[in-house]
Amino acid sequence: MEKDSQATSSDTSIEKEGVISQSLSKDGIPNQSLSDDHIGIENISVQPSKLYEAVSALRNYGFNYLQCQGGYDEGPGKNLVSFYHFITVDDFQKIEKIKEVRLKVFLKRDSDLSIPSLYEIFKGSDWQERETFDMYGINFIDHPNPKRLLMPEDWRGWPLRKDYIQPDFYELQDAY
C-alpha cells in the first residue's frame, strides 16, 4: 500500500516518536507515533503491508504476549481500525516492570480490508481475529480458520460497524 493511500486516524494526533517507534524506525519498519493513551501506553500506527514485519520485530524486542486484538469503527465514512496490545511476560518479572505497546492499523472503509494474520507468531490471535472479522469485516490473510465466530455463516453485514443497518426480524417474531 502506498503511503498516500494509507488511512490515518481522524481523532488521534501524531506525537513525538516513542522508544518502541524509534526502534522500529531503526530497523527500517515505517511507522507513525500516535498519542499515548491515558495510562501512558505507547500507540503506534503501521501500514497493513508492514504489520507482520512490525509484530515480528516487537517479538524480538521481548513483547512475547498478545494481550488483546480487536477492532473498532471510527464512524460512518471513516476508518476501520485493527489494534493489537502486546506486553512482556517473564516468570520473574515484577508487575510494575511490564512493558506494553499498542499497534494500530487504520483501514479505509472503501478500500481493501485485508491484513496479515498474526496466527503464525501468536497462536492466541486465532479467535480474536475471527471476532474482528465477524463484527467489522476485516479479513485476516492466511488465517487457518477464517469463519465467522459469533454470527451465523450466512449472516450479511458486520454488526459492530456504525453504518450497519439491522435487518427486519418481524418474520422471525411471527414464527413463535
Curated annotation (Swiss-Prot):
Keyword NAD: yes
GO molecular function terms noted in the UniProt entry: NADH dehydrogenase (ubiquinone) activity; quinone binding
Keyword Lipid biosynthesis: no
GO term, biological process aspect, one: photosynthesis, light reaction
SUPFAM superfamilies, A to Z: Nqo5-like
Alphabetized UniProt keyword annotations: Membrane, NAD, NADP, Plastoquinone, Quinone, Thylakoid, Translocase, Transport
Pfam family, one: Complex1_30kDa
Any one GO cellular component localisation term in the record: plasma membrane-derived thylakoid membrane
Topological relation to the membrane, as annotated: Peripheral membrane protein
Region Disordered, annotated ranges: 1-30
Superkingdom, natural source: Bacteria
Reactions catalysed: a plastoquinone + NADH + (n+1) H(+)(in) = a plastoquinol + NAD(+) + n H(+)(out); a plastoquinone + NADPH + (n+1) H(+)(in) = a plastoquinol + NADP(+) + n H(+)(out)
Subunit composition and interactions: NDH-1 can be composed of about 15 different subunits; different subcomplexes with different compositions have been identified which probably have different functions.
Family stated for the protein in its record: Belongs to the complex I 30 kDa subunit family.
NCBIfam families referenced in this protein's UniProt entry, alphabetically: PRK12494.1
Protein name: NAD(P)H-quinone oxidoreductase subunit J
Source species: Prochlorococcus marinus (strain AS9601)
Gene symbol of the encoding locus: ndhJ
